[in-house]
Amino acid sequence: MIFQSFLLGNLVSLCMKIINSVVVVGLYYGFLTTFSIGPSYLFLLRALVMEEGTEKKVSATTGFITGQLMMFISIYYAPLHLALGRPHTITVLALPYLLFHFFWNNHKHFFDYGSTTRNSMRNLSIQCVFLNNLIFQLFNHFILPSSMLARLVNIYLFRCNNKILFVTSGFVGWLIGHILFMKWLGLVLVWIRQNHSIRSNKYIRSNKYLVLELRNSMARIFSILLFITCVYYLGRIPSPILTKKLKEASKTEERVESEEERDVEIETASEMKGTKQEQEGSTEEDPYPSPSLFSEEGWDPDKIDETEEIRVNGKDKIKDKFHSHLTETGYNNINTSNSPIYDYQDSYLNNNNTGNLENFKLQLLDKKNENQDLFWFQKPLVSLLFDYNRWNRPFRYIKNNRFEQAVRTEMSQYFFDTCKSDGKQRISFTYPPSLSTFWKMIKRKIPLLSLQKTLPNKLDTQWVSTNKEKSNNLNKEFLNRLEILDKESLSMDILETRTRLCNDDTKKEYVPKMYDPLLNGPYRGTIKKGVSSSIINNTLLENWEKRVRLNRIHTIFLPNIDYQEFEQKAYTIDKKPLSTEIDEFLTLINELGNEPKSSLNVKGLSLFSDQEQRRAKSENRTKFVKFVFNAIDPNEPKSGKKSIGIKEISKKVPRWSHKLITELDQQMGEFQDRASIDHQLRSRKAKRVVIFTDNNATNDPEEEVALISYSQQSDFRRGIIKGSMRAQRRKTFISKLFQANVHSPLFVDRITPLRLFSFDISELIKPIFRNWTGKEREFKILESREEQTKREEKKEKDKKEDNKRKEQARIAIEEAWDNIPFAQIIRGYMLITQSILRKYILLPSLIIAKNLGRMLFLQLPEWSEDLQEWNREMQIKCTYNGVQLSETEFPKDWLRDGIQIKILFPFCLKPWHISKLYPSRGELMKKKKQKDDFCFLTVWGMEAELPFGSPRKRPSFFEPIFKELEKKIGKFKKKYFLTLKILKGKTKLFRSVSKETKKWFIQSIGFLKKIKKELSKVNPIVLFRFKEISESNETKKEKDYLISNQIINESFSQIESGNWPNSSLIEKKMKDLTDRTSTIKNQIERITKEKKKVTPEIDINPNKTNNIKKLESPKKFFQILKSRNTRVIWKFHYFLKLFIQRLYIDLFLSIINIPRITTQLFLESTNKLIEKFISNNEINQEKITNKKKIHFIFISTIKKSLYNISKKNSHIFCDLSYLSQAYVFYKLSQTQVINLSKFRSVLQYNTTSCFLKTKIKDYFKKLGIFHSELKHKKLQSYRINQWKNWLRWHYQYDLSQIRWSRLMPKKWRTRVNQSCMAQNKNRNLNKWNSYEKDQLIHYKKENDSELYSLSNQKDNFKKCYRYGLLAYKSINYENKSDSFFSRLPFQVKKNLEISYNSNTSKHNFVDMPVNLHINNYLRKVNILDIERNLDRKYFDWKIIHFSLRQKGDIEAWVKIDTNSNPNTKIGINNYQIIDKIEKKGVFYLTTHQNPEKTQKNSKKVFFDWMGMNEKIFNRPILNLEFWFFPEFVLLYNVYKIKPWIIPSKFLLFNLNTNENVIQNKNQKQNFFLPSNKKIKNRSQETKEPPSQRERGSDIENKGNLSPVFSKHQTDLEKDYVESDTKKGQNKKQYKSNTEAELDLFLKRYLLFQLRWNDALNQRMLENIKVYCLLLRLINPTKITISSIQRREMSLDIMLIQANLPLTDLMKKGVLIIEPIRLSVKHNGQFIMYQTIGISLVHKSKHQTNQRYREQRYVDKKNFDEFILQPQTQRINTEKTHFDLLVPENILWSRRRRELRIRSFFNSLNWNVVDRNSVFCNETNVKNWSQFLGERKPLYKDKNELIKFKFFLWPNYRLEDLACMNRYWFDTNNGSRFSILRIHMYPRLKIN
């Protein structure tokens, strides 16, 4: 068995090796290329099908295979690839050959290729067949691209090691595939020839010469097919000759721009990040070859060829292009356009020898004048055809306002080149481009063999050995520190600290980092961000010298003067430490100096004269070495680099020499100097709509008021240069008129999902179930308010979507008219025609017809009324967008731009006019509901509400006529049936009348019945109405029925009996029979009626001819009842079944409703208790202060008021879930008698304790509500290994992907990390009770410093500690009850610190803020203060503004942990522990309206219980202002501009903060004040501002803004006066201090934009249209009044003045401030802090943590005294190692980084198995005991150690990650990381 499995395993491994081998993969890829059929197959197919003789077939096959073999060889052999891939040669070969081939096949008589006696291989036709197949196989990849083979081969070739073997096997696979293909083709052809059915076809037999003609014309058919195919393929590639050329910018412009742009350097990370995404097509590579050009990765033959051509053409090419290169690379700031290079160098030499600059200038100008008249044909042909500087590629023009010339988009962000690292050749992405260029020039000059000889490998071995030694030393030091720690010595000796120079040891003032010699890294110099104007405007001489020195190497090492490449690559050498290639170069220079002869080929320098060459030869070696070093040494002072500091690594960005203007620029006339030039950029379709022209002035376009109207159609051409190549995107299409992106048809079903079965089943079942059960009341309870609001929201949403759909259809029609050529002309004429037809033909003819009709019907005509309405109708000409002009004026260029015709007061034909003296109330209501009385004329003469809208329904002319007719017919029917009724009642009188009279009467009744029947068909409703009005007397009704029935029977018998001769006997029998049947019928009917009435009566009919007088005997009656009973018994089973079902349904519904009803009762009782408490409070309040009451606003009223404020914020759910448990139980506890017995059973339920807050449980336990044995239960946790699931464990993180994407990352990170930075005090148990003392110290420290520095010396240490804690918690979260680390940096607690000692109470573990919903981040909540703290960096409670609506969102305030603080008493007077004392109230950063009055008061209340009392005397500034502008809250992200300097308190602009601090310093602080005392003290405090009292009413009144703002301004005025007088500063005087505050807010900190309100936007546009109309009218009063009546013009917007300040606009709701989400360029440190996610903190935030490191590492023997042992929980007897989770923390951060890099990147074993061997083997866990040297391990399960991952976050490799993100991550810019490669922490090794 073992042997078999061994054999099987070997077999499997052997098969895997064979499958993965290079040969098999090559064969597979080669075989695949068989299916890559291109145009080259046409010749092979033609030869196999049509050619006669084996020679031609053999030659075709040979040529085909030879061409493919050349292609495979060219993949590996670069020169052949260059030769084949050069577009010039291929073009030169292909175009004449195609012409020749076409000519050959169509004019064969020019060539005699008949059979000769010579050798057949010399036959021209056979050679042509060979050439056809060979050349077109080569064409297939370049002119006629087939991408499958190239992609597959290149992808694998890049990965493959043995490239020759792969290419060979690929060719063999291709050969096998094609042999099989040709064999199969031959078999098919033989089968066709031999198939009898094909040959015996009737059509073929009838046309004898059909096959012959087909064979003769096959050559032409193939040539036509080939031509069509070539045109199709070439259509994707723009012809280089036919491409639209662009004119270069004028010389003066270039000179100015070159001066402006010379020293400008753009950081590639920010400026170039979007360029890669803008490139499209398949040929948009870099035209400048990179140093890794001949590697197999992504190079293009086109760009190589451009480079080669420039080399070949040498001097002439450089003449014309040198100026543009100087301009692009920034070397030129004099007018050197078209200056030849040899002049440049001659002048340089002369200038070097003589120093005479003027001679140089004169020489330049002379040479320029000489060359001005040179003709264009001096340029070579290739330069004319293929100019790399032309826009003949699919580039979009990225316009930069600072630099008018565009950046060349094909330049890369990074520079890649190979260098040696650790003795291995590696690709570096931050290689200095200048060094690469220089090294390339040296390699060209010196043979490769000599370079290899002169570069020994000693440096590499030395480099590796030193690195190993350093790594070993670091590991030893690390382990030594760990051993000392195991020996339980003092921990402060173990920690590695950073040494810094200190000015004052007591104050801990350090030397600035920039001047600290003990620091290294980026602090040692300033970073030069840009170049000042003074440096730019240096003298000509200095710039010239600088440029000359930069070009020294160029003059020495460049044989062919490839200026095009050099000017792009010769950047200034970067300030990075030089890599190993510099060292290699230095050794090379030394060897050159020691040689007797220089190995440089100086004779090859073509630009030197002989005299100069001799002088160069005679130079001394030392001079040569100095000369080279002067040229390349970046630190030489003579090189013109006078600025001190570190220059950032950046590239000179090349620019195009063209200035391109868009179509819109040309229309707007912005570039008047280039008005004659046609636009070169395609812009978005737009129209310039002139809405007003000042006719009095000249025709200056500035006197016109114009709007730009953009087309909303999908336009994927915009931004593309005219004549540029389009993208070679196949399989893409545009399916909609408005489409954001181009989609592939493969994914159409995913884009538009099928909605056939997507319906809500519950919505369908609910009405059926409701009707079945008939229980409406229960369903009313079941359907809560939420469902009602949801339904209403759904209706509103559907309505909005419907309107949106209609709007899109309208826009689609508008765009369609725009796109169709000549459509506007046709439409304009049609509209004018329809307007004339309507006004002068159609409407007058209708008026005439109507009045003639009235005259025919003998009614008065209404000529005057109709003509008056007809005259009232106005047809106003409007622009295409609906801007009104006048009745007579036509828009400018209306035939081209389009026209609209707006009809004011449209005429509607009415059948009659109602007198207007006394209009009825219904008409008045109709007028109110009526829409605006205007419409737009459509092309078909219809009326539409909006331009291009759907035609509206016009009121019908005949509808009121029909209604009137119906009324009259109804009246007639009523009268008619009343007469019928009277006649029917009097039929009794006709009993004694003779039979003849009866007969006549019966006939008349029959006739009337027919009429009645017909009328009932016409209008049955009226008939039934009259039927219901019947006699009330039932017996009378029954008698009448019997009488009429008997009359009918008698008539029946008489009519029938008239036909018999002896009718007396028969007549009597039939009479008896009819009597009997009628009696039975009457009995049945009477019984049914009696059953209904339950009053049995026996009706004795006297009109019987037989002797039976009493048929209704009881016996008969009981028989009928018996039959009924049998029927009931038969159906009893079904009755029972139905009854049981109904019973079940009732029970089921009642069970469902029980929890709903109980919760409702509970909430109602809670509400009553709360309201009772509030009413008591308010009664007391009124007794003390006679002020207006504020009613408690419960959640429902909040919801209602918010709904009234704005229906736009329909996603606000003020649900009862927002009420925290703390709030509810606090209100319950405040009742006079605590009677919670009714809740005892609920609270004692087993699962309840899992969901109640811990401190609430403790509180109720003391009250005796909870059982004492009920412990703090935790929900069961499951072992999940992954980080995602750990996050998902906290429900706040468990969101859908869409909602995650809507989160603002910075806000969420900010909120999450607020608790991480909390103060770290109260370490000792002895200091646990000294709250006030510590708070006062902390309070003073915080207020002493104005601006905080970036960080103190412990910031990084604490940051790394928290970082390690987070990493640990992600692994060991399951054992939360056993490990000490019960608090995580993700928690947000009541401003308690993250306790680093051992507070082991279970309830503190990961106590996520249950009610701080993540919804806060997903929407802008319109509640007063709900989002006040969202953008704070820290969870700083001093700036949280509590209000009524916020209590439901913050639950952390009632966490009174008796276990952790035994001295805290839970009573009425001690509600809350406050561990931070702030000025002006803990929760309210207030504006003291009267600081002097505040100073007089002896007491200052800092805190009312959780802010729950309804009136708080000091309201914050922002509490008023942001109520109306919730968008302001988003602006608190101050990190966008000044991230680390501005402290939190300065963001709130309370300018008198310091004064208030001084006033309040010596006052008694009342910390724990109950609500009753608070009420008493309130009378002594500052008066409450009216804005707080009026807040509730303001909400319901939809925000009455003015009183609040006016009061707010008065408050602020006092504040500003106070601050101005005390500080003595001269401030800008504002009209309103709100404006001053706003100005400070906007000017100093934030990027912002002013956005119109949505509702205002539409109103403003309507106003603009009306204004445009009024400006043109002579007497605009009438139109103005009618516009106001029709609500077209909004008067509140009309009142906006020109000088209205910003605050007034905001008060009116006109403008809303919102931030601009711009990418702001940050320095590297800021990006690092952002990426880490646990950011640095302000200095003041950690000043209370001075004891941090002294108390953190204490002696382990005394460790237990720091462990807090709770009263009711188990005592933690285990000693806790709280810092040994992350052993690296012993080292300092810089050394830690070094340890990680060395241990990871220097790892010799790079395989996954070797790397993770520590963790994959359980037995190796004991090796970690050196870190955790304990008798008892901290962990329960050793396997958890396997999950001990240490993340390689980019805080130490940020620059590498930012550069490598294009390869490691799926992003194109360095601003975000989509994924990080996380590696296991490697095992420490000591060699």
Swiss-Prot record:
Record InterPro entries: TIC214
Compartments (UniProt record): Plastid, Chloroplast inner membrane
Keywords linked to the UniProt accession: Chloroplast, Coiled coil, Membrane, Plastid, Plastid inner membrane, Protein transport, Transmembrane, Transmembrane helix, Transport
One Gene Ontology CC term in the entry: chloroplast inner membrane
Location of region: Disordered: 248-300, 786-805, 1569-1603
Lipid bilayer topology: Multi-pass membrane protein
Principal localisation: plastid
Record's compositionally biased regions (Acidic residues): 256-268
A Pfam family recorded for this sequence: Ycf1
Bias-annotated ranges (Basic and acidic residues): 1578-1597
Domain of life: Eukaryota
Transmembrane feature ranges: 18-38, 64-84, 87-107, 124-144, 172-192, 221-241
Record carries keyword ATP-binding: no
GO biological process, one term: protein transport
Coiled coil (UniProt feature): 775-816
Function per UniProt: Involved in protein precursor import into chloroplasts. May be part of an intermediate translocation complex acting as a protein-conducting channel at the inner envelope.
Subunit record text: Part of the Tic complex.
Family label: Belongs to the TIC214 family.
Record-given protein name: Protein TIC 214
Native source organism of the sequence: Solanum bulbocastanum (Wild potato)
